[in-house]
Amino acid sequence: MAEPLALRSPDPQQEPPAWQPLNSHHRLVNELWRLGQVHAAWEAWQAQADPAVPPPPEERLAEGRLRLAVGDTWMGLDQLWWLSLRWRNPSCHQRTLLHRSQFPRLFEAEIQTAAEQAGVQANLLRAIAKQESRFAPGVVSPAGAVGVMQLMPSTATEMADAPTSTLMLKDPADNFELGARYLNHLLEQWESDPFRSIASYNAGPGAVASWAQPTDQDDDALWVERIPYPETRFYTKKVLDNLLGYLGGNQSFCNETGAGMGQKRAGDDASDHDQTHQKQADPGGGQNTDADEIEPGQQHG
C-alpha cells in the first residue's frame, strides 16, 4: 500500500481562514456582516429577498454563507454544494470563496479539545462530521444515530464507559469527545490505516474485517473501489474528499494571471449525491448514517 495518511499525528499547521466580506447585493446586509451581527444580517437578507425572483449565483453564495453563520448548516452546505455544480464561469475569487465555504470550521474549541484528548487529527473529525451530520447537533437518524458525529447510543456508552443519553449526545462537546475516542479505537484496530478506519466508522469494523484486506501491493484507491457496500464505498470517498478539502486550507483557485481554475472534486456530481440513498444497514457498532440521507426535518429530532 502507499504511505498512509497520518491521521493520528498532529494536524499540519494552518492559518485560520481570513475574514471575507459577504458581497451581497444588499448594503445593509453587508454592513451587518462586517460588524459581526450575523443573525441580524440573515434577518435583513430574508426581509429583502424576493421569493418570486431567483437570486443570481453570487447572491446564492451569500445566502449559503449566511446560513452557515447562523447555524443552518444543513441547508447552507446543501445550497453551496448545488451552487458548485451549477454556477457557470464564476471569477477565480468567487470559485475560491465557494470552495472554502464548503469546508466550514465550526465548533473549533470542541473539535480541538476532542482531537487532542483522543490523539486524532482535528481535520479528520471535521471531515466525518461534515459527511455525517453537516455539523447539525440535533440530527437523529432513522436508525438512532445522534449528533454531529452520528454516534449510535451503544457505541457512545461503550466509549464513555458510562450510561449516555440522547440529550448528552446532542451536545457537540460530548459528541465530538466520544466520536474522537471511537475514531482512535478504530485507528488502533486497523494499525492507523485511514481507509479501513473510515470505512469502519460507516459500516462497522465487523463488516470491514469480513472483506478482502489490502496487501502491500494494493493501491489504496483500488481497495476503496472494491468495498462491497456501495454506500460505504461512497461514504469513504466523500470523507477522504472532505479531509483533503480541510487539509487544503486556504487553497486558491486563481493562477498567476488571476484566471479561474477548476474546482470540481472527485465525487462532486449529482449522481454521487443520489448514491447516498442506497444506504446499507450497519452490521457493527458504529455510526450508520450520513448527512445526505437524513431528511432536513430530522435535524431537530
Give the positions of each predicted feature.
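Catalytic glycan-binding domains that act on GlcNAc-containing polysaccharides
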Residues: 1, 12-17, 28, 48-260
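N-terminal leader/linker segments that initiate helical-solenoid repeat arrays
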Residues: 2-23, 34
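Alpha-helical segment of the N-proximal tetratricopeptide repeat
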Residues: 21-40, 44-47
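Short, strongly patterned local motifs
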Residues: 255-301
